[in-house]
Amino acid sequence: MRWHTWLLIKDINPMTASKPSPRSRKDAAATAKASTDQAAAGPAQSPATTPAPPARKPSLKKANKRPEGQWAVDGHEPLNANEVVKAADDGLHVRPRIIDIYSKTGFDSIPEDDLQTRFRWWGLYTQRKPGLDGTANATMSDTERSDKYFLQRIRIDGMPLSIQRLRVLASISTDFGRDTADITDRQNLQVHWIDVADLPEIWRRLESVGLDTVHTAGDAPRAFTASPVAGVSANEIVDPTPVIAEIREKWIGTEEVSNLPRKFKTCFTGDPSLDVAHELNDISFVGVRHPELGPGFDIWAGGGLSANPHLAERLGAFVTADEAAEVWHAMILVFRDYGFRRLRNKARMKFLVEAWGVEKLRDVLEREYLGHKLADGPAPEAPTEPGDHIGVHDQKNGRKYVGFAPTVGRLSGTILAKVADAAEKAGSDDVRFTPYQKLLVLDVEPDRVDQLVADMEELGLTAHPKPFRRNTMACTGIEFCKQAFTETKAPAARMVDDLDTRLADVTLPGPITLNMNGCPHSCARIQVADIGLKGQLTRTPEGETQQTYQVHLGGGLVSSNRDDPGLGRTVRGLKVTPDDLTDYVERLTRRFLEQRADDEGFAQWAHRAEEDSLR
């Protein structure tokens, strides 16, 4: 692989790496001096800031403000333990040690810094020891909660999965992962129960079909989400596939972008359905038509959820497909150099956007990194079709694509192998995952659609799902995740089946999305679901610890059913136990149907309803 050869033969300084921006061409010594001077004066400010009042003594508080670890302002001195580990050795460099040493000497030989930090640069997390409940999160360290097996995240980047690729993924699951395989809401595949001894063979199989795991975790550019119908959609504005390929070829797996303040998430879509949750990414490229410049992308920045949710904001800038890769590269360097590194819970791109505003972000991007202005451009138009692509749809080439709904993204290697067989039988060589934990089979001849739908139905994958099967997502949960407090996949699957049965007597006016997360990190996007359930531990009246779920209601992203994105409201004091989840959601849904005004969706009702109606 290109990145593996590269990292073994070349040591690139992250400030002077390939394709230098205008900023990175500056003299290093001058930059270091300027950084030191600026650090003494405080964080960098835009040219438009108000000058200091004359003859006024500087504020002692401001003068003594702690550095935030911005490389371009404070220099490169590590300000926390994670930054020390990254400065000592890039996460990319652990790969040869995994292949040549740890796979032979075993789990117990792996040093802590590699195991709990650098392994992540290759998509590896130690999974949770079986049997540990949520209280262990407070009483045991990360290492103490770690089993001797790994979650392996496989980078897909929205790419088509050929039948050959799909069979390789299936073989990795069945041969090494105890038949586990989960589609994530970033279109990746996660396999559990991975032994370090098997990693060289797993990576060999992936690389033989053009797949890899690089930067699927860690403080690096994470795997991209992309429209799962890129290049085939009958309504597509612009195809992002060449842009993604250019970025992967030039920068993914290079040291220039492998030491960021935190993770950096990217999405691309040229489909008018807005099918990639663009409001939740660090940078988003959304297809639009410029009145003079033609098709291209509208740029958004600063999205993310977790405990401090922020929705991405438009920069108001337009780029063509030919410019998009360069702009992505420039933006990630802005984040690398100016992102806040001192506190990890304040180190995401959204906090830089919050501190600067999009006007300053765009100015720094253009002036310091691109060296030219970007064109102003239009905002995306409101979507008129659902973005989950479930069901049968036309392609631009006259063929069909069909979207199927696994239950909360859970598959298996056995099922993946049978999906490959069904797709091949239908004449397809193109299967894709979606950002909603769904699966598409593309390039199907019209006369083979019915047989494909029937074959997939036998695998438990339906093209015509009932409402909650279609609109429910869940994270990994306490089954494997060390951060989780509660279960997710199993209770969500039970809820889906029960709710679709219990509510078969009603007709919903639109989709009600139900997202379940096992902790506050919101990997399953709870704050932007109609009904979001966040796992937590609470006390019973008798003082016993129990699993419960905090409820968020009325969140959502722009869709064919919603004009504006927004976060859900929480219901004060409401804690729903696992046994009560189905009853609660059924009760809530029926109240919505009873109390809604004409043409009122669930989110609108949830935000105006009295709290008693939401309990």
Give the label of every model feature segment.
Residues 53-170, 364-425, 440, 462:
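Gly/Thr-rich phosphate-binding loop signature of adenosyl cofactor/nucleotide-binding cores
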Residues 258-358, 529-594:
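Mobile "lid/hinge" segments at catalytic clefts and subdomain interfaces of large enzymes
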Residues 3-6:
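Tryptophan (W) side chains
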Residues 396-400, 407-433, 581-585, 589-604, ...:
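Long hydrophobic segments that form regular secondary structure
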Residues 197-198, 205-210, 336-395, 435-436, ...:
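Terminal amphipathic helices with adjacent charged low-complexity linkers/tails
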Residues 18-27, 54-60:
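Arg/Lys-rich low-complexity patches in intrinsically disordered regions that function as generic
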